[in-house]
């Protein structure tokens, strides 16, 4: 797209998503995410009735009497958006491609963040980390994020959610609120293969323990069901492989639908094990209602 077309598209998304963030989501965001984080404030001498789990043993040893750590609510949050830029985002059969809805959802979350005076950053990932935008405040920063959401083209086309989560773990030392925005079409995300080399614990488990992690699945109707249109040449958007498929065969359509259902059940298993909040949004659905459901979980 030309620079002028990009500018017009940025402006269109800004008007739509900034209004949603300010008028609808700001209050929900504040009540859901503010106050979840606790930051170290000071140490003071232990008093009867204090929680012994808060004892600072290093200070206690130096002072030769017990001291405890005092924590207070963090007034400022950092929000990280993990945005899938793999080849499968360029698929869409109804009203828009998945990448378009991902951009709007991410922009809405970004504007909600700055409306509450918090910082927002972005990790673009395929089967590697494609781009990292460090968290900052301010409208100009969000507009920069929107431009990247609309125009960024990745080097690779595969998907590795593990890489994105591991980067988040390494890059964000303090607890943050993170949204994984993807079609979640990565088998490693739902299998035991995706583990940390250090601990042997699945990376998604480590990430959800360290950070407040939510999953937003963006998918197309045809991701879940195959139409009956006869012979169809199907291309895998991530591997580039092309095969002829006879969609008139009910067995083919049923196998396709079952593969989708199996994937969704595997995702539910991940959510159950990690306690992650999550929502699925189809590209022809209203994402506003879906985000409201997510904020109220």
Regions found by a protein language model. Give the residues of each.
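Von Willebrand factor type A / integrin I
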Residues: 1-33, 42, 170-174, 188-297
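An amphipathic, basic-hydrophobic helix/alpha-beta surface used to engage anionic
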Residues: 1-135, 177-182, 187-188, 194, ...
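Short, solvent-exposed coil/turn elements at secondary-structure transition points
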Residues: 49, 128, 155, 219-221, ...
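A generic local structural motif
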Residues: 66-68, 164-167, 200-202
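Conserved phosphate-coordination/catalytic loops
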Residues: 100, 155-162, 258-261
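Short, contiguous clusters of charged residues that form electrostatic/catalytic patches at enzyme active sites
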Residues: 104, 108, 159-166, 265, ...
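Short, electropositive alpha-helical surface patch
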Residues: 132-147, 269, 296-297
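Von Willebrand factor
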Residues: 141-176, 188-194, 220-221
């Amino acid at each position: 797209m030309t620079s002028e077309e990009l500018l017009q598209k940025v402006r269109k998304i800004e008007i739509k998503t900034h209004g949603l963030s300010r008028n609808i989501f700001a209050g929900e965001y504040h009540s859901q995410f503010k106050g979840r984080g606790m930051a170290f404030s000071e140490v003071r001498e232990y008093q009867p009735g204090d929680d012994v789990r808060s004892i600072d043993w290093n200070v206690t040893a130096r002072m030769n009497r017990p001291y405890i750590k005092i924590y207070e609510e963090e007034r400022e949050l950092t929000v990280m958006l993990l945005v899938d830029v793999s080849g499968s985002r360029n698929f869409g059969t109804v009203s828009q491609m998945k990448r378009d809805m991902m951009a709007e959802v991410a922009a809405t979350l970004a504007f909600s963040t700055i409306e509450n005076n918090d910082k927002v950053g972005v990790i673009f990932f395929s089967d590697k980390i494609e781009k990292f935008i460090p968290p900052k405040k301010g409208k100009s920063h969000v507009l920069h994020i929107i431009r990247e959401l609309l125009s960024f083209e990745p080097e690779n086309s595969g998907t590795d959610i593990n890489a994105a989560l591991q980067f988040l773990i390494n890059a964000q030392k303090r607890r943050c609120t993170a949204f994984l925005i993807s079609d979640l079409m990565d088998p490693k995300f739902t299998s035991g293969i995706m583990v940390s080399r250090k601990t042997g614990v699945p990376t998604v488990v480590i990430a959800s323990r360290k950070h407040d992690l939510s999953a937003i699945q963006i998918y197309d109707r045809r991701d879940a069901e195959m139409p009956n249109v006869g012979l169809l040449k199907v291309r895998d958007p991530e591997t580039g492989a092309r095969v002829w498929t006879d969609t008139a065969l009910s067995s083919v359509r049923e196998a396709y639908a079952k593969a989708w259902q199996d994937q969704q059940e595997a995702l539910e298993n991940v959510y159950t094990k990690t306690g992650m909040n999550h929502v699925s949004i189809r590209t022809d659905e209203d994402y506003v209602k879906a985000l409201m459901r997510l904020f109220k979980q």
